[in-house]
Amino acid sequence: MVERMKKDTGDETKTKVQEEPPSPSPPPPPPPRRERQKQHYWVPEREKKQIERHIHRTSHAREFTDKPWRQPRLFSETTLPKIVLEEESIPQAQKRRQAHERELLQIKDHRERMIRGRELLQQRLKDRILRKSPSQIPLPEKRDQVKKQKKEFEKVVAYPLVQPSCTSRIKVDVLMEKSQDEEDLSTIIKPFGRRFLAVPPFLRTQIGKIKDL
């Protein structure tokens, strides 16, 4: 009986051992983390300046907050404004007189500077003229010759030789040089502006005979 019980208990243990599920295997260790490669991005100049300004502002604010709290000054250490007594104050009339004197001095200095500058300018012009050779300075006779050499033109209406038959005549404005004889004649003062008809030749002979008689 005892052996049979032992056998039965042995079979039960065997079945119990066989029925127990296998223990799960431990998970594999995680792979080692790889460091991310640094990536560089192009930033425009304007955005870069804005970022720098923002960093500067934040650092300035951080410095201000990090400063230790300062104790207020005592009343004895504070500097009070200087109080001017009425006796020391300058009257208004004296101030006006002093301002007027300063303006007069400024005007006087300005006039002196203007006169001095004018004198220096005239002196420089004289020196520049004296430096030039006498051949470059035109004499009065040469000036008259240059004036005479200048030509004057006048506008004259001309008609071409070939004219169209069905339309009106063609007019052309031409610039012609003025002759000096015409200028001399124009300078002569005429006593009368009347125009007389020309005497025919046969009458001239008769008039001459009458005068001879």
From Swiss-Prot:
<comment type="function">
    <text>May be involved in male sterility.</text>
</comment>
<protein>
    <recommendedName>
        <fullName>RNA polymerase I subunit H</fullName>
    </recommendedName>
</protein>
<dbReference type="InterPro" id="IPR040005">
    <property type="entry name" value="ZNRD1-AS1"/>
</dbReference>
<feature type="compositionally biased region" description="Pro residues">
    <location>
        <begin position="21"/>
        <end position="31"/>
    </location>
</feature>
<feature type="compositionally biased region" description="Basic and acidic residues">
    <location>
        <begin position="1"/>
        <end position="19"/>
    </location>
</feature>
<feature type="compositionally biased region" description="Basic and acidic residues">
    <location>
        <begin position="60"/>
        <end position="69"/>
    </location>
</feature>
<feature type="region of interest" description="Disordered">
    <location>
        <begin position="1"/>
        <end position="70"/>
    </location>
</feature>
<feature type="compositionally biased region" description="Basic and acidic residues">
    <location>
        <begin position="43"/>
        <end position="53"/>
    </location>
</feature>
